[in-house]
Amino acid sequence: MANYKIWVDADACPNPIKEILFRAAERKALPLVLVANQMLRIPLSPFISQIRVGSGFDVADQYIVDHVAENHLVITADIPLAALVIEKGALALNPRGELYTTDNIRQKLTMRDFMEDLRSSGVHTGGPDALSAADKQNFANSLDKWLARVK
């Protein structure tokens, strides 16, 4: 399992998703690293650690990009970060259970840029829905599929 690791873009990661990740790291004895610009509450575990980075735009993202490797999994809702880690041979999973891949990341980036253009022109696009029980279950299922492959 030494070649596998889970990275978390932790500043924006919902707490219920972190709890799922904590349990998975313990169950599988898999390294889990949460990267954030603030201290987080994490369980005492030899498998779970946190990296506190300085404040600033995309500082945590850059840390993850600099340290991620092939076969790692990154938990993030940040589509540009997902694109960067995919380029390095890692996988990216969002907190709703959607896996970003080489097959779908370009489309996701295009849609993100389009929505950003709409917002900057004054169109109100709204934010994402609150994390639902179905989202949590989808995330847990997607994580379990990845964990089954790394065993």
Swiss-Prot record:
CDD domains per the UniProt record, alphabetical: PIN_YqxD-like
Pfam families per UniProt: DUF188
InterPro entries listed in its UniProt record: UPF0178
Signal peptide boundaries: none
Family statement: Belongs to the UPF0178 family.
Domain of life: Bacteria
Protein name per Swiss-Prot or TrEMBL: UPF0178 protein SO_2894
